[in-house]
Amino acid sequence: MALEVKPRPSLDSQHFHVVVIGGGINGVAIARECARAGKRTLLVEQSDFASGVTSRSTRIIHGGLRYLEHGEIGLVRESVRERERLLRERSHLVQPIQFLFLLNEQSRRSAMKVRAGLWLYQRIAHKPARHMGEMELKRIERVLDSGHQWSLFNYEDAQCEFPERLVAEWLTEAVDAGAVVRNHCEVLAVDIAHGRAREVLLRDRNTGKDERVDAAWILNCAGPWVDRICQRSSVRTAKPLVGGMRGSHIVMSRFSGAPNAALYTEAADGRPVFVLPWNEQVLVGTTEVADTGDPGRTAPSNEEIEYLLRMVSQLFPKAKLSIHDIKYAFAGVRPLPYTAGAKPSAVTRRHFLHDHSDEGAVKMISVIGGKLTTAASLARECARKIGIQVPEPKLIAVGPGSALDPLLDQEVLEIARAGSVSEETARGMMEWHGQRAIDIARMALVSAELRAPICPHSSHIVAEVVEAYRREWAVSLGDVLLRRVPVALGACWSESCSREAALRIGAVLGWNDLALGANLEAFEMERTAFLKRPAQHTSVLEAAAD
């Protein structure tokens, strides 16, 4: 079979009530909110949805325990409320995870301070704490560096292993509500006329065609590119709006003694460091380094990789970790509010809405900051800012993909029977697609090609790729394998997996040899630029692990 991918209709000369620039989690959440309110909404993204900061984060949905140190109780309260909402509505994507706060005799924080902070954290949550068993606590303590006296403090937060999937679901809901969405569509400028933002000049990167749309409101949600959009549009702010902060992570094979809980500790320089179970691997992050370069080309430095490897090696000396345990490293630029001379840890994680009226651009607003946890509440605030009435959260209907428990064997069996696929495949489909999994499974019955695994080492099937192209606005192989069906983030993925996946996907999409080669080459370029293999820096990093 060959899947027909329809060309995208032109946007030229169309009118929208709201144009949202930037397809990360904040932009998608805002577009969804505006569309649900019945406003004609356009969402544009220069690359792919969730390809920026969203897919380069620590992947936790948290109340913000450390925000309490800076007195940001309101932000913690908001974050906890949104965490609980995501746990309830997106239970297949967002799950509780046990955290351990680690202290030793060299830690800057005292045990009393941590105990008081956790007490307040639980009070704000209005939720009884679930604690780890004593045996598991002792097991973790045994594998930590025995040269220190450790104190372990247990609390609960949440993890979204694949925020790319959360974005895909919200995107689907935005379109179902009437939004028009375009990825791989660059904003060349916002046209300002007579003191008002009126039009947006776009370039479709797939066709190379320039298009112009007009809007009642223009919302700049471009993350670390916010200031660039302003500069291109001749909107002059008194100071930069965003202070880009690079956060790097390393992904490691699971090692002996690797915890099933998330660990939260501090490095020698006081920086918080997380060690988390993720995607059958171990995720370690993050750093905070000022970054004024192109956010699209950011990459972890040798020094950052060394720093993170040294940190986790010091925590688990018995594991004898080395460069060879690192599968890859990645980095993203967090769009924190610009604060001259401030320490990174002191910069607020609260979001801000900057109205450009005083700068000669009425009806244009830039969104600064924001995080995975509070994207939905930011969207409601932004919609209200531009005069849109939005329902209270309790009135919002739960959409596709919610209200499923990925551990329910009955649901897994139903999906497996519907698609004639294995229980392992059915479980993976449910965890990534929620209630849509049953429709994808039924589609898979059409042919053996659709039931085939994407690559020999994956339980995810080609039918999920078809769903990505048909309903989730995937355009390239990278859109699919890194974000919609992110199997390429797995522990064993290699260039040979890329080739095998391209062959199987190409057979369904009807690619000829030329198209297959072009798609594969473009994907490998994107994958290797995003997921940096540290083996090329062995001489630097082996010393760090010794």
PLM segments and residue spans:
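Dinucleotide-binding Rossmann-like beta1-alpha1 core, especially the glycine-rich loop
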Residues: 59-141
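Extreme N-terminal leader/targeting segments of oxidoreductases
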Residues: 1-18, 33-36
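Flavin (FAD/FMN) cofactor-binding and adjacent substrate-gating region
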Residues: 103-182, 190-196, 279, 318, ...
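Flavin (primarily FAD) binding-site architecture
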Residues: 220-235
